[in-house]
Amino acid sequence: MTDKTALSYKDAGVDIDAGNALVDRIKGVVKETRRPEVMGGLGGFGALCALPQKYREPVLVSGTDGVGTKLRLAMDLQRHDSIGIDLVAMCVNDLVVQGAEPLFFLDYYATGKLDVDTAASVISGIAAGCKQAGCALVGGETAEMPGMYHGEDYDVAGFCVGVVEKSQIIDGSQVRPGDALIALGASGPHSNGYSLIRKILEVSGCDPRTTMLAGRPLADHLLAPTRIYVAACLDLIASHEVHALAHLTGGGFWENIPRVLPAGVKAVIDEGRWQWPAIFDWLQQAGNVSRHEMYRTFNCGVGMVIALPPAQVDSALARLSQRGEQAWLLGHIAEAQGDGPQVEILR
């Protein structure tokens, strides 16, 4: 016989029963995202998904992302309901720029101590984002790792796979001087620049819960979920000659637009064609942030940039408006001189 205490996994800080309770909580919302190509349900060692039969030469497009330190702000403010939408948006918006239809999504949720209510709120948001994007939430991993995170802090990552017809891949190679640039409006800072945002909040001493901006608490502006552009962009791709799409994330205008431009051209953007949403004016003033830094860090109200022939601008804007998007003519493509920058913003 031994006098040693019998230890369990729960004694070490891992509650398997809580994990099972979470799965039971989320089964319903996950089921609502199901696509006909998905085989089986939650609980398997792997998720099975067939390719849609409409594709003759299907090419898979994959992506993974997180939401950065927007998560820290959400935890500090105890607002977890829309972080999942952010997570999906950051992945699916990257896929659609290549013309891909998102097929399925998986998430990774890691925490020091699993709070079932918080995790269920986050995953419900992921399911809501998947429904917006038309992709199935087919599985995920919930990792309770005591000692790795402080208290009930958590981190999330998303993984998405989409499909595009090989002949319809959008890679920017068709962009030409004279092409028009259309902007799709953003819902806020989306999921980028939050380390600077949190620094501005610290330096300014503002409480985002009580500081009002344009009739709403600052927190509402900062935690507005990232807009998911999949449905509108796929519809536009099917009906118009889209030459390129750029999702404005980390690196803002200066770094994301050149990613879809061929050599020898540049994007000329007319700053007078739109007004920054109030949150970006506030951030610039409260943090004394330079104009160049604003365009490098934030989307400044532009979530997606689309290049297409100028003759199609009016019909494209009408189509996007019908889809509920705020869209406007942002600028044009011009010839670039030498090794100069591929983005020029005119004041």
From Swiss-Prot:
CDD domains: PurM (cd02196). Signal peptide: none annotated. InterPro entries: PurM-like_C_dom, PurM-like_C_sf, PurM-like_N, PurM-like_N_sf, PurM_cligase. It holds the Pfam family AIRS. GO terms for molecular function: ATP binding; phosphoribosylamine-glycine ligase activity; phosphoribosylformylglycinamidine cyclo-ligase activity. Its EC number is 6.3.3.1. It is found in: Cytoplasm. Keywords: ATP-binding, Cytoplasm, Ligase, Nucleotide-binding, Purine biosynthesis. GO terms for biological process: 'de novo' IMP biosynthetic process; adenine biosynthetic process. Its main location: cytoplasm. It comes from the Bacteria. It catalyses: 2-formamido-N(1)-(5-O-phospho-beta-D-ribosyl)acetamidine + ATP = 5-amino-1-(5-phospho-beta-D-ribosyl)imidazole + ADP + phosphate + H(+). SUPFAM superfamilies: PurM C-terminal domain-like (SSF56042), PurM N-terminal domain-like (SSF55326). GO terms for cellular component: cytosol. PANTHER family: TRIFUNCTIONAL PURINE BIOSYNTHETIC PROTEIN ADENOSINE-3 (PTHR10520:SF12), TRIFUNCTIONAL PURINE BIOSYNTHETIC PROTEIN ADENOSINE-3-RELATED (PTHR10520). Belongs to the AIR synthase family. This is Phosphoribosylformylglycinamidine cyclo-ligase. The gene is purM.
